[in-house]
Amino acid sequence: MTQTIGIHKILCSGPADLAAAAQLIESGALHPDEIVAVMGKTEGNGCVNDFTRDFATQAWCALLAPHLGVSAQAVHRRVAFVMSGGTEGVLSPHFTVFTRSNSDAPPSSTPRLSVGIAFTRDFLPEEMGRMAQVSETAAAVTAAMHDAGIGNHSDVHFVQIKCPLLTAAKIAAATARGAAPVTHDTYESMGASRAASALGVAVALGEIDAATLADAAIGRDWSDRQSVV
């Protein structure tokens, strides 16, 4: 079985503007059942209180649900949505849609683009930025490699992760249970979550032995790093 990957760049005037995407679907140029991932840039501030990312994701789920015959919640579990807030300067709001289809065509004799996706479970607030997140991310990267049909670590050149962050409500919930989050600063949690995610990639690709890592080193020991973007 051979993968065929399609990439569509779709401009938008706002987080919920999917008119161009709807037109592509209606014309037959974009098949909803082949969509595996959507990456987007919205006009939000990119900070903790940027809700344009969730708004855009909800809009996509609502658009695709009737075409796929499933609920909007099911779409969220089927398609990898990665939204990034902030379009300052010359960057325009847009979505990049990745599609994947399989055929019986013979495989290429040279390396080609392959795409795989995977999801972690939801993390408890006190797990974010710690080894639990590293381990779960590593498992997800391994699953994504399998989904993409990639068997060699050296063939992985890009891993896109949408990692969670702490909010005031999550911090309060953890504290009420007697658990201690990695930080009480929501902005600092963004860095801790990214660090744990990056180390998870490194573990999955065999660049770091998970046994050498510990909670205290995440985001602090700069000798531990991953080389894949």
Regions found by a protein language model. Give the residues of each.
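Terminal domain-initiation and capping elements
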Residues: 1-229
